[in-house]
């Protein structure tokens, strides 16, 4: 598991909202903290919304959006399968978005 990996994450049936039932996510935990029992992830969506907290990317030939405004911690036991890695240019854009989103 590494920062910027796409992972399929086990859906949580206890939550009713679609965003809460994770699915495809991107790991955003810094590499220095990757050995912790839970990781920070940003879920993906195919719904386009003009929000500054959404980062556009391509996944398996389809356009998607990383939802920085929906970041949450997920236990490693919920990670099902690695599906790929973000392209370098999208990694840079995501880091810029994270810095802006969490600016104090």
What are these language model-derived features?
Residues 1-104:
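Conserved functional hotspots at enzyme active or ligand-binding sites that engage polyanionic ligands
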């Amino acid at each position: 598991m590494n920062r910027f990996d796409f992972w399929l994450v086990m859906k949580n049936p206890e939550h009713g909202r679609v965003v809460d039932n994770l699915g495809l996510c991107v790991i955003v935990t810094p590499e220095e903290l990757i050995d912790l029992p839970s990781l920070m992830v940003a879920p993906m969506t195919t719904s386009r919304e003009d929000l500054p907290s959404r980062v556009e990317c391509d996944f398996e030939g389809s356009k998607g959006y990383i939802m920085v405004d929906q970041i949450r911690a997920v236990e490693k036991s919920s990670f099902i399968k690695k599906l790929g890695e973000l392209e370098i240019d999208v990694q840079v854009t995501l880091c810029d978005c994270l810095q802006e989103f969490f600016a104090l």
